[in-house]
């Protein structure tokens, strides 16, 4: 209608949780030098899978939770302190679940990465939902999809595991817009 509005909103600093995990094997806190090249290669695969830009518009639909009745044990933005060493914030949402629990696709998408054994994330799936929006599912025991496969919301895509850098069976999900990390909780249909 030709009307322009200017709205000023105050931005508040958010306090994030601090998660301290002690008693981890040293290789889970600081990887040995001999795996640096592997980690670099894994990061390239993940970066390439998240950089996909398509005209799909699946992201405009409601995201459904990937697990039924799961307990959230890790939240976006929380500071991780492993064996007393501060690490990067956690950019995902962790769901505790029994190993082998079925994981469902949160949204329609196209698989851009399906790997069974990445160093940090273990069994990993990345979906393209259009215009740079992607979701990641990590630490899977079983990856049941293939790159290029089209998936519908609610389809079985894998099972919960404790692969990669993990202290127990759980599912870690991530939401990205290209390389920008977003809080998955902000889009999950409750």
Task: Cite the ranges covered by each PLM segment.
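Non-catalytic extracellular/periplasmic "stalk"
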Residues: 1-76
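Catalytic cores of peptidoglycan-degrading enzymes
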Residues: 65-190
């Amino acid at each position: 209608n030709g009307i322009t509005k200017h709205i000023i909103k105050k931005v508040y600093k958010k306090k994030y949780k601090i998660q301290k995990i002690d008693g981890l094997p040293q290789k889970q806190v600081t990887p040995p030098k001999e795996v640096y090249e592997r980690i670099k290669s894994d990061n390239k695969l993940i970066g390439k899978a998240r950089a996909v830009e398509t005209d799909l518009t699946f992201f405009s639909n409601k995201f459904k939770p990937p697990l039924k009745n799961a307990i959230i044990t890790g939240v976006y933005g929380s500071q991780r302190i492993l064996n007393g060493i501060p690490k990067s914030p956690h950019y995902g949402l962790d769901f505790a679940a029994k190993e082998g629990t079925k994981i469902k696709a949160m949204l329609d998408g196209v698989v851009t990465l399906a790997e069974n054994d990445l160093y940090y994330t273990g069994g990993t799936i990345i979906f393209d939902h259009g215009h740079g929006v992607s979701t990641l599912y990590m630490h899977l025991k079983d990856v049941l999809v293939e790159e290029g496969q089209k998936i519908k919301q609610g389809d079985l895509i894998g099972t919960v595991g404790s692969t990669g850098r993990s202290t127990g069976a759980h599912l870690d999900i991530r939401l990205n817009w290209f390389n920008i990390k977003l809080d998955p909780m902000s889009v999950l249909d409750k």
